[in-house]
Amino acid sequence: MRHRCKVPQLGLPADQRKALLRSLATQLILHGQITTTLAKAKAVRAEVDHIITLAKDGSLSARRQAMGYIYDKQLVHALFEGAQARYGNRNGGYTRVVRTLRRRGDNAPMAIIELM
């Protein structure tokens, strides 16, 4: 039984799900907004919030933890340089999920996730 399991499964094995969330988080931080399914947007929201919280901390251990998650090293450096100025007064809630039209092929609910 999977009582109280908070991890969204997304229909994937654990290693593929982790790789998907890492790539979505990397692309979201790189581009500022991405369009994906609603379930994936809600799943990546917590991951990106955690990475931005690490960037606000700015310590060496937080930087190494972020480098272990984000695929692009230069992106981590850029995030850590600008996070305190951009998100300094905000305690969480760094992303916004906006629902859009359903996908044409399979009628899946789509959403735009963007950084605040």
UniProtKB/Swiss-Prot annotation:
| Any one biological process term the GO annotation gives | translation
Domain of life of the source: Bacteria
Q: Name one GO molecular function term.
A: structural constituent of ribosome
Record flagged with keyword Ribosomal protein: yes
One cellular-component annotation, GO: cytosolic large ribosomal subunit
User: Which InterPro entries would you find in this protein's record?
Assistant: Ribosomal_bL17, Ribosomal_bL17_CS, Ribosomal_bL17_sf
Please give the subunit comment from the record: Part of the 50S ribosomal subunit. Contacts protein L32.
PANTHER family linked to this entry: LARGE RIBOSOMAL SUBUNIT PROTEIN BL17M, RIBOSOMAL PROTEIN L17
Query: Which NCBIfam families does the UniProt record give?
Result: L17
Family note: Belongs to the bacterial ribosomal protein bL17 family.
Q: What is this protein called?
A: Large ribosomal subunit protein bL17
- In which organism is this protein found? Microcystis aeruginosa (strain NIES-843 / IAM M-2473)
Q: Give the encoding gene's name.
A: rplQ
